[in-house]
């Protein structure tokens, strides 16, 4: 089984939440970075080596739709799943990322009226798909500081496998004042954000940590490679279909009016208005209390049971996976034998 550690009764009701654009898309074991995209090569692999697994995933998605047992986190998840599996869902259902609302604390620009610089804050793990967006943001921030002489600071909260690589790159920057913090306790996070942030930069759940406080928050999309060309920045409240970060493709470059400089100009002119829009967007779409109620409704509507999926061998490990795991096992075994 794909999920060999999961044991459940035949009458167990199931509901699937697609939380990553490539969750339903087959990839080669050990080569996820190569196949985790919509590039020509990744599509070629999907439609040749992984064609049988692709068809299986396609049928699985259709089954879940019929059973009202599939939810998508956002439009990006839905669109990429539909595009790569060639499935058009008639009535897709969304369950957005939730976050617990802050009871009293709210962002206020007057807290920074005496500040001579614009203080940016990044929160998030620094891993493969977040490294390149963060690197690109620092490059854009540096360009603005040099050309427009706008004093800026960037605080980075987070660690990860790509932290050392980013730190080495960032510390060569002599234009942007940088500060690195490994971790801040969750109970202290709201207070820290409010006291240290003009503009927050993040993706996913981290972006909601700013929006729920009314902090003007720029969304970053994710990428497994360098980001070229003019990047399209947007506030959280400007996003569509609950997207809090998309897999970068040509659509991210269509609107060249959304440069980082333009967003900074908007902030300088109407920060309080942006703040109210961020907070309103969060309350309407991502507040934990409302999202949890939606989840309960979706659970009651699901007609999917483990017995049906098991009988159709949905969880059976694909042949291509067995082959790759066998080869990898032999390679590792031979390496251990080497002197």
Feature map (PLM): residue ranges:
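A short, active-site helix/loop in glycosyltransferases that binds the activated sugar's phosphate group
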Residues: 46-92, 101-104
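Membrane-proximal basic amphipathic "stem/tether" segments
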Residues: 29-61, 305-339
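Short acidic alpha-helix that forms the nucleotide-activated donor recognition element
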Residues: 62, 185-198, 202, 208, ...
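Catalytic binding pocket for nucleotide-activated donors in carbohydrate/polymer assembly enzymes
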Residues: 206-268
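Active-site proximal beta-strand in glycosyltransferases
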Residues: 7-48, 71, 92, 219-220
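Nucleotide-activated donor-binding/catalytic signature segment of Leloir-type glycosyltransferases, i.e.
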Residues: 165-185
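Conserved catalytic-core segment of nucleotide-activated headgroup transferases in glycan assembly
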Residues: 100-165
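A charged, aromatic-enriched C-terminal amphipathic alpha-helix characteristic of glycosyltransferases
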Residues: 250-319
């Amino acid at each position: 089984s794909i999920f060999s550690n999961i044991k459940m009764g035949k009458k167990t009701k199931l509901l699937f939440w697609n939380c990553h654009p490539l969750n339903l898309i087959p990839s080669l074991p050990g080569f996820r970075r190569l196949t985790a995209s919509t590039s020509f090569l990744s599509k070629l692999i999907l439609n040749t080596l992984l064609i049988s697994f692709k068809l299986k995933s396609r049928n699985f998605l259709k089954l879940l739709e019929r059973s009202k047992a599939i939810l998508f986190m956002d439009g990006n998840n839905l669109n990429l799943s539909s595009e790569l599996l060639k499935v058009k869902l008639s009535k897709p259902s969304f369950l957005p990322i939730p976050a617990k609302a802050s009871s009293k604390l709210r962002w206020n620009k007057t807290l920074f009226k005496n500040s001579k610089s614009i203080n940016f804050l990044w929160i998030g793990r620094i891993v493969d798909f977040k490294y390149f967006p963060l690197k690109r943001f620092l490059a854009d921030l540096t360009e603005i500081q040099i050309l427009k002489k706008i004093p800026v600071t960037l605080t980075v909260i987070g660690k990860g496998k790509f932290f050392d690589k980013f730190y080495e790159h960032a510390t060569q920057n002599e234009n942007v004042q940088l500060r690195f913090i490994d971790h801040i306790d969750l109970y202290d996070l709201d207070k820290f954000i409010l006291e240290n942030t003009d503009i927050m930069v993040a993706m996913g759940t981290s972006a909601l940590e700013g929006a729920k406080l009314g902090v003007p928050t720029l969304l970053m999309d994710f990428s497994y490679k360098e980001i070229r060309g003019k990047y399209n920045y947007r506030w959280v409240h400007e996003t569509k279909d609950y997207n809090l970060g998309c897999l970068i493709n040509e659509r991210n470059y269509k609107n060249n009016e959304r440069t980082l400089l333009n967003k900074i100009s908007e902030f300088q002119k109407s920060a309080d208005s942006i703040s109210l829009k961020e907070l309103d967007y969060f309350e309407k779409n991502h507040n934990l209390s409302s999202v949890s109620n939606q989840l309960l409704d979706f659970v009651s509507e699901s007609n999917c049971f483990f017995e049906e999926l098991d009988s159709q061998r949905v969880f059976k490990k694909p042949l291509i996976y067995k082959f790759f795991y066998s080869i990898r096992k032999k390679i590792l075994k031979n390496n251990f034998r080497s002197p």
